[in-house]
């Protein structure tokens, strides 16, 4: 792995966050538990929404797609992480690393864009309730989701193709658990200025513009809520947005901890922040959305009761 320029057929070594066998065992069980909780939580959300016709609304349509994205997101990284934590062979092929990177970038982008669309849905529901049914028609919902997928696929494809132009020299040891773009760029020995430029340009378009849109949407939502005369009405309106606002804060907070810093200062200590957005956020989303949501509680109850009844009969 050391010395010289290396071809596309070579491998990277994912050394993880620690080389201590004891710490690796702890990390294995921790990530396995988090993965199982994430899968269970997101699958239950998807099944509850799809099985209950009362939840066939734009808000829950996008929530189900967000859960699907989170499910795919953790499955892209955690299984390989678990294998590496239990194995002496920590190699990942060049093609495997780029494939993992592509899905990582695409799914983070998809999460971000779906959150922006969900903010628009809440804005229309609270600020323009009389026009909600026509404004958020099934056709528009499918169109918005399709655009989210198109932009996400393109974003991941652009940066993955740019990564194929990067030359890696010397050690290909990645002191982390999966192929993350900043760690890969730190191993480059060729000129990566174009990667920086495109990353900044596309990042502003894909992340900062949706963030600005969400901030503007919630500013209008807050103004609309403050104009509601009754305290009960204010509470009900705010409760429909609180969970989404919490998820947005968690998503952008952890993402900002990783990417809002110069590439040269990026180090393994920042891997904790990467774990936050790559593992913790997808795990927490189902709990945040269902914590005080009576509709989700009811749908989950009916789903589980139906499964139990089927077993009895």
UniProtKB/Swiss-Prot annotation:
Transmembrane segment boundaries: 26-49, 58-79, 101-120, 140-158, 197-219, 237-259, 272-291
Q: Which GO terms describe its molecular function?
A: G protein-coupled receptor activity; olfactory receptor activity
The stretches that face the Extracellular side, renumbered to this chain, are 1-25, 80-100, 159-196, 260-271
Give a Gene Ontology cellular component term annotated to this protein.
plasma membrane
Pfam families in the record, alphabetically? 7tm_4
Q: Give the subcellular location.
A: Cell membrane
Bridged cysteine pairs (disulfide): 97-189
Indicate the principal place this protein occupies in or around the cell. membrane
Give the UniProt keywords, A-Z. Answer: Cell membrane, Disulfide bond, G-protein coupled receptor, Glycoprotein, Membrane, Olfaction, Receptor, Sensory transduction, Transducer, Transmembrane, Transmembrane helix
Per the record, ranges on the Cytoplasmic side are 50-57, 121-139, 220-236, 292-313
* Bilayer topology annotation: Multi-pass membrane protein
Which PROSITE patterns does the record associate with it?
A: G_PROTEIN_RECEP_F1_1 (PS00237), G_PROTEIN_RECEP_F1_2 (PS50262)
Concerning its family, UniProt says:
Belongs to the G-protein coupled receptor 1 family.
Functional description taken from the UniProt entry:
Odorant receptor.
* Name this polypeptide is given: Olfactory receptor 1D2
List the source organism. Answer: Pongo pygmaeus
What is the gene name?
OR1D2
